[in-house]
Amino acid sequence: MPPTSNFGQDITNTTPNDSNNNNRDESNGNSISIVNIERMGGTQLLPRLAGKGVIRVVGRCEDAKENNNLDLSECQLMHVPDAVYHLMRNTELKSCDLSSNVITKITPKFAMKFSLITDLNLSHNQMSKLPDELADLASLLRLDMSHNSFLTLPAVVFKMPKLRQLLANNNAIIDIEADQKQISSDSLELVDLRNNPLTPQCYESLKSAPVNFHIELTERQKEDWEDLTI
């Protein structure tokens, strides 16, 4: 197998590969051969993705080279493969959609490689943490981290200099990593925290927080024990 550094050259197949038409991605007109991907080291760089999964990821990377919007939603990804960074190395991405996968974490490398994106969709995954390096996404305007497994709202979201919209609804968030003094932003317009089991203290703190952006909360129902006096 050739070294992985060769991966990212022309891996599209413009001529038929015998009669094996099942190895092509017909969804967007690309005819990407598994055989060619293997020759370029694709299976080494894209672990846990087999057959059509590799074709789908590579095909969407090729599309992103044209429109600067990387859509890797519903690709059964557990993480962002190194091959994706390699394929996108000469492309200035505007947005990245990683929704509806099984991703458990984003590595610090992501912020370095995709530093110019303005929209990041991480929704419908299995994430519980964000790396502090995401604060380096200096152009990010919108972050969707809804429908994940976050137990706390990461403090890094308040360090993104241009972030306007933060969607963190439908998680398991009970508290915020930052204290009240750190819940501030010159750019934020909306923080959606609906459908999270916030603690009573956190809920009241957010509801009365002296911030210049709107915080959406699901009206909290008091537990029976909260009305008890000792």
Short names for language-model regions:
Residues 106-173:
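A generic tandem-repeat structural signature
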